[in-house]
Amino acid sequence: MKKLLIVSIMFLCFSYSKKEFIVSIEQPYEKKLDGLKLEIFLDKKKVKETNLKANNIMPSYETFDMYTSNEGKHLLEVKLKDTVFGYDVKYPEEKYIIVGPYLKKNGKIQMGILKQKEGFIFH
């Protein structure tokens, strides 16, 4: 009986899998974006706060995990300065996400996003 209980507890522990989004923040090339605070929210909850580090030599990324309790559609919000960019993301169809801030020619900030089911390969 003890063995059955232990096996069932182990099965429950291993069968429980955390649902997570893998998010990579592309660091900007523009020096005007250096040092700006970037905040990321998932379903209105803050999950990440970081400062951008401009780099004009080669692309660099800051990667982190965001956990969610259920599958389906979620709201991903990226706040940079006083602008909030909102995106619908679906778990598990869009598990891997890259966000990247850019400056338009008129000086306004634009946020780019890539979403896909499989992981990105960075060279």
What positions do the PLM features span?
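Short beta-strand/loop motifs in extracellular/secreted proteins, especially
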Residues: 34-38, 74-76
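Extracellular beta-sheet/turn segments enriched in Thr/Pro/Gly and aliphatic residues
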Residues: 90-123
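Bacterial signal peptide processing site
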Residues: 15-19
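Beta-strand-rich interaction surfaces with strong enrichment in secreted/lumenal proteins
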Residues: 64-66, 75-76, 86-89
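Sec-dependent N-terminal signal peptides
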Residues: 4-13
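Structural motif
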Residues: 25-36
